[in-house]
Amino acid sequence: MKAVFAILFLAFIALTYAKSYDEVKEEIKNEVEREIFEDLEEESDELDNYVEESNDAKPWRRWRRAVRRIRWRKVVPYIPAIVRAAGKK
């Protein structure tokens, strides 16, 4: 009998502190809107970077950006083979 009262008491506490359906729906809506705005900001930043690259009058800056974008972790293992091949010529 004590277990039943304990379960009912915990259920009562849970229902007391539970949010209403409308509050939960509003919170989910706000979270989705926040994620959409974050995605739009990221896309806007990417577009701004692309505009900078295409309008850049200094070619060395474009070259430097291209070098920075290289995924060095994938390239590094091949560097010794490239050096050996270049040294044989």
Curated annotation (Swiss-Prot):
GO cellular component: extracellular region
Residues bearing PTM Alanine amide: A86
Domain of life: Eukaryota
Main location: secreted
Compartments, as annotated in UniProt: Secreted; Target cell membrane
Keyword Protease among UniProt keywords: no
Isomerase listed as a keyword: no
Tissue: Expressed in entodermal epithelium along the body column.
Residue stretch(es) of the prosequence: 19-57
Transmembrane domains' residue ranges: none
Annotated signal sequence range: 1-18
Keywords assigned by UniProt, alphabetized: Amidation, Antibiotic, Antimicrobial, Immunity, Innate immunity, Membrane, Secreted, Signal, Target cell membrane, Target membrane
Family, similarity comment: Belongs to the arminin family.
Function: Antimicrobial peptide with a broad-spectrum antimicrobial activity. Keeps its antibacterial activity under a wide range of salt concentrations that mimic physiological conditions of human blood, which is surprising, since Hydra is an obligate freshwater animal with nearly no salt tolerance. Does not affect red blood cells.
Protein name from the UniProt record: Arminin 375
Record organism: Hydra oligactis
